[in-house]
């Protein structure tokens, strides 16, 4: 059995690296979602004229990992209070969004955000919960970016700490290497 979800959490290199080794995740594909341009390029998305956000499509086995577990990991590596920004990555293409494919995902995402807000841990959460409209896979050179370029500056400074945080906090959900 396989299910799918679409998450925008800033740079898709980060999101792919974070979810890639999680038990129950079958595939993580970086791409673009939520905009109006058909088959956009990276350059077009970065221009902020397409309406798309850098997004990952996550294919997962719901018998091994729940959508709530995926949301917990997602919220652990993003700043849900900044609009159109994650760290130094600024622009609408770096916005945070959950693109739900059904009412169950919508309900779970909305409830998760309500519970986070009620916890007092964050000020106002700006992660949008939007119906899935489209997803376009990113160019091949974006796939497995962190794995292929671990010594690149952005990978060392931005991606690696997020991956390490998830491996420490969710060690019991990491695939055996």
Curated annotation (Swiss-Prot):
Keyword flag Cell inner membrane: no
Q: From which residue to which does any coiled coil extend?
A: none
EC number, UniProt record:
1.8.4.11
GO MF: L-methionine:thioredoxin-disulfide S-oxidoreductase activity; peptide-methionine (S)-S-oxide reductase activity
Keyword match Ion transport: no
Q: Which GO terms describe its biological process?
A: protein modification process
Q: Which domain of life is it from?
A: Archaea
Q: Which Gene3D superfamilies match?
A: Peptide methionine sulphoxide reductase MsrA
Catalytic activity, as annotated: L-methionyl-[protein] + [thioredoxin]-disulfide + H2O = L-methionyl-(S)-S-oxide-[protein] + [thioredoxin]-dithiol; [thioredoxin]-disulfide + L-methionine + H2O = L-methionine (S)-S-oxide + [thioredoxin]-dithiol
Listed A to Z, the keywords are: Oxidoreductase
What are the positions of the active site?
Answer: 11
What family is this protein classified in? Belongs to the MsrA Met sulfoxide reductase family.
Q: Which PANTHER family match?
A: PEPTIDE METHIONINE SULFOXIDE REDUCTASE, PEPTIDE METHIONINE SULFOXIDE REDUCTASE MSRA 2
Q: What does this protein do?
A: Has an important function as a repair enzyme for proteins that have been inactivated by oxidation. Catalyzes the reversible oxidation-reduction of methionine sulfoxide in proteins to methionine.
* Listed name of the protein: Peptide methionine sulfoxide reductase MsrA
Lineage start? Archaea, Methanobacteriati, Thermoplasmatota, Thermoplasmata, Thermoplasmatales
What is this protein's gene name?
A: msrA
């Amino acid at each position: 059995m396989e299910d799918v979800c679409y998450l925008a959490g800033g740079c898709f290199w980060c999101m792919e690296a974070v979810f890639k080794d999680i038990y129950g995740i079958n595939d993580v594909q970086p791409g673009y979602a939520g905009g109006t341009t058909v088959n956009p390029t990276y350059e077009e998305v970065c221009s902020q004229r397409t309406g798309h956000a850098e997004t990952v499509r996550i294919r997962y086995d719901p018998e091994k990992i729940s959508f709530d577990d995926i949301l917990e990991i997602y919220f652990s590596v993003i700043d849900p209070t900044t609009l159109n920004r994650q760290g130094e990555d600024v622009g609408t293409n770096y916005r945070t969004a959950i693109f739900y494919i059904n009412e169950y995902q919508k309900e779970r995402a909305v409830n998760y955000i309500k519970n986070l807000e009620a916890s007092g841990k964050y000020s106002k959460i700006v992660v949008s919960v939007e119906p899935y409209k489209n997803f376009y896979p990113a160019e091949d050179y974006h796939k497995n970016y962190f794995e292929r370029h671990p010594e690149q500056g952005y990978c060392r400074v931005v991606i690696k700490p997020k991956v390490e945080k998830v491996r420490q906090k969710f060690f019991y959900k990491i695939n055996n290497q």
